């Protein structure tokens, strides 16, 4: 399963605004804040140096993953498509359903806290309402 429905660098919005109806549609586009959570699994990365490249306010990418351990798994990737971790399993059921239904989700880094060998990435998840 490779559903990758996100807004990265406002590409979706720019496609709409370049359309002849873009000026009418653009004011209707809004981001609805859904939830704050964190990125799970940051201690299990193959390349933990990727955690040094992220910044507060950065937009991340969500991608559904075909995962035998969690049927609702959602990968969290940086803009270069490098794995940062997952939306926590306890939080992913609604977001996976939205993504599977074709909804566009946007993620922003809200905070980064380094604790010993653990990096906690706090994120905000938004629904892009077109």
Annotate each language-model stretch with its function.
Residues 1-130:
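Conserved active-site motif detector
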């Amino acid at each position: 399963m490779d559903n990758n429905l996100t807004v990265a660098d406002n590409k979706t919005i720019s496609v709409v605004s370049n359309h002849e109806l873009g000026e009418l549609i653009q004011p209707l586009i809004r981001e609805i804040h859904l939830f704050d959570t964190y990125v799970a699994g940051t201690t299990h990365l193959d390349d933990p140096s990727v955690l040094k490249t992220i910044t507060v306010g950065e937009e991340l990418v969500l991608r559904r993953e075909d995962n035998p351990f969690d049927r609702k798994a959602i990968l969290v990737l940086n803009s270069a498509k490098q794995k940062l971790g997952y939306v926590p399993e306890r939080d992913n059921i609604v977001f996976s359903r939205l993504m599977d239904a074709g909804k566009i989700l946007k993620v922003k880094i809200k905070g980064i806290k380094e604790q010993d060998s653990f990096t906690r990435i706090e994120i905000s998840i938004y629904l892009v309402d077109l």
